[in-house]
Every structure is written in C-alpha cells, then in structure tokens.
Amino acid sequence: MSGRLEKEERAKRMMAAKLSELPAVFTAFYDWMDAREKSYTTMKNYINHVVEFKNFCDTRKKNEFYKKVTDDTIDRYMTSIRRKTVNGEIVEIGDDIRAAKWSSLNTFFKFLAQKKYIESNPMLLTERPRVRTDHTVTYMTPEEIESVFKKITDEARPMVKNRDFCIMAMGLGTGLRVSAIVNINVEDVDFVNNTIRVIEKGRKIRDIRFAENLRNLILVWMKDREIFFNGEPTGPLFISQKKGRLSVDSVEGLVKKYTAHLNKKITPHKLRSSAAMNMHGAGVDILTIASILGHNQVTTTQRYTSAYDEDKKKATDILDSLIT
C-alpha cells in the first residue's frame, strides 16, 4: 500500500516545482483541490488543462488571465480544441477529451468564484460537450483467458513466468487497476484473511479479497522473487530484474505481449473489464460487482456493502475459477 504513497509523494514534489513557475492562483487552486481529497492524477490533469487554457487567453496580464474571461472566451477555446495537427494531418479530438477539459475549467472557475477571485462565473453560461458513448465493451472470454495463461506458461522466461502469471491472474481475479497492482507491497498481503490492502483511485483504502488459486500463485511468485531476484521480505511485491518496483508501463507491455494472439486490443484496464463481464455472465448482481471494483457510479453500493460480503466471496470464487 505504501508504494502508492511513495509514488504520490515523488509526484507531488514534481508538481510543487511546476507550481512555483506558475501564477500564485494555481498553487491556491491545487491546495483547494487537495483539501477536498481529489486524487493526485485528477489535480495534475486539472492544472495542466487550466495552463493550456491560460496560454490560449489573449491577455497581457497572464497572472490574472481569468479576470477577463467570459463565456465567449470559453466557447472559443472549446471550438479551438476540436481538432489538432499531428504529423501534418488534422485529426479530430475525442468528445471525452474535450469534456474532460471543460470539467477542469468548470472546477477552476468554481474555485475562483468561491474564493472571490472573480465576481461571476462564466462557466455557468456554457455547456459541457456531449460525449457520444460507445456501449461496446472489450473483454476476454474464459476461453481467451485460458489461452493467455497457456501462452505465459509456454513462452515466458523461467525467472519471470510466475511473476507474469501472477500479475495477469491478479488483474483478472480481483479487478484491481494496474496502478494499484504495481503499488502493492509484500506486507500488504494478508494470507490469514486472504486479502490485499490497496490505495486506489481517489485515495480509497480497500481490502481486496482473493481466493485460493490466486493465493497459491502469489506464494509461488514470492518464492521466485526471493530465489531469482534476491527480493527483500518487505517492499514491492512485483519487482523487475533490477529489483525495482515494476512500473505501469512494464505491465502494459506484458499484457500486450501475452494477448497479441487475440483478435482484439487488450490493455491492463481490459483485465478489469474482463473481470466485470465474467462476473456478470455468471449472474453476479451489479451492486456486488461495483463494490468489488470500487466503482463510485453506483452510489448505493457503500450502503449495502456489508450485506453483500457472502456474495462478494462467491464472486471472487467465480473469478478464481478462471485462473488455472
């Protein structure tokens, strides 16, 4: 669990250096978001989006660029980011990206209005871009999952085979985000209660249940970790050959390699989708799935979590049956 905290502390130091080069209002905005427990990734994205907007604004007083902003300024900016030039070609910017940038500005101007930097909020006269949703979900079927594990067994190098198998199994068997998986420390794994304590998106601390097959895979990897990598009894659970914490990029590379034979693009997040879809296909209710995945969208999940403990165990067992 502390792995994520270590990473966030390093990132915050980098952000502090960046903020020192920006107008003071950015530091105030960052502190305002931090007090409201926004995730570091969210705060970083919001700052970057507002900096981009600041550069768009045509004003000599760059430190107080926000004071001359009107709803027309916002509309012109949103129009300007519909397209961009990449390698000499004009490409369309996705609705979701434009909506994210609008949300960043909306939060920024809400902050400005609350703190009396501005008299009126121009965002109130603008509209969030509509996002055209594609309801097609890419995920792996049980047969495809089996083929991926076979590929790891047949092709992975001996010293990383059990590590890679365990990472894929953990993504499929728990639905954890890859950022949470790489930040797990050995001491976060509780073999008595079969749980892993993680810090997830939005700084949520959760105890994730795992079943017997995954338990055995973790134990096998921990032996290899000690034998092949001279791993310490504490610290990062998943390490590279250089003994450092495995990165998100490294896991993305592993997933890409072991799923290359499938006729679909599988990313680490698709392991999460696969976990959800296979639970759904086995008849697990939506509240239980939302609770296991840590989704905020199902607002009643928190209320019913304790009542679904047994269902969550059954759901975990369903996912565990995919790991052979």
Which residue ranges define each predicted feature?
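Conserved catalytic core of the tyrosine transesterase superfamily
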Residues: M1-T324
